[in-house]
C-alpha cells in the first residue's frame, strides 16, 4: 500500500492506475446550449502515486474520435486542473469534443474519456413565433404545440426562450 498525501487521491492498491474524472467546461459536465464566450476547462485526478500534476494537455476536436483537432495545448507544465482557460473561436449551435491528458511528478499519465460541450445561439435572430395568452385572468396558461416533421429526424435541438418558468416535453418525456 502507498502512503496517503499530495493533492491527488492516492491509490490503495498497487495495480490501480491514475485516472481523470469530473472533467468540466465552465464548471459543468457536458454543457449544452451556452454562449461559451469564455471557455474554461477543469478536471480532477485520483489514484495517483504522485503528489502533484507535472503537466496537462487539453485537446478540442470537431469529432468524438478526436481526429479533427481544433485546439491542442501541448504538454503545459503550468496548467491548473482547477482553472484552465482556452481562447477558442466557437461556432454557434455546434458540438465540440474534448479530453485532457495529465501527468504526475511520479511519471504517471492518464487521459480522460472524451467529453463534449455544445454552444447555443449567438447573435442570431429568433425565427420562431411568439405565443401568449389573450386572457386577462390571473392564472397560469398552458400552451401546447404539436410538431410533425416532414421526414424522419436523425438529430434535432430545440432552443426555447421564455419568461418565468417553463417545461418542454418531447413525446411526453
PLM regions: where:
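Aromatic-lined ligand-binding clefts that engage carbohydrates, nucleic acids, or primary amines
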Residues: 149-150, 154-170
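Short, Lys/Arg-enriched N-terminal segments with co-localized hydrophobic residues
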Residues: 3-17
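Short, conserved beta-strand segments of beta-strand-rich sandwich/propeller modules, principally
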Residues: 40, 95-99, 155-157
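Pro/Thr/Ser/Gly-rich low-complexity, intrinsically disordered linker/stalk tracts
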Residues: 18-48, 118-122
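Recognizes extended acidic, P/S/T-rich segments that occur
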Residues: 51-95, 101, 105-111, 130
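Short beta-strands within extracellular/lumenal beta-sheet-rich domains
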Residues: 137-149
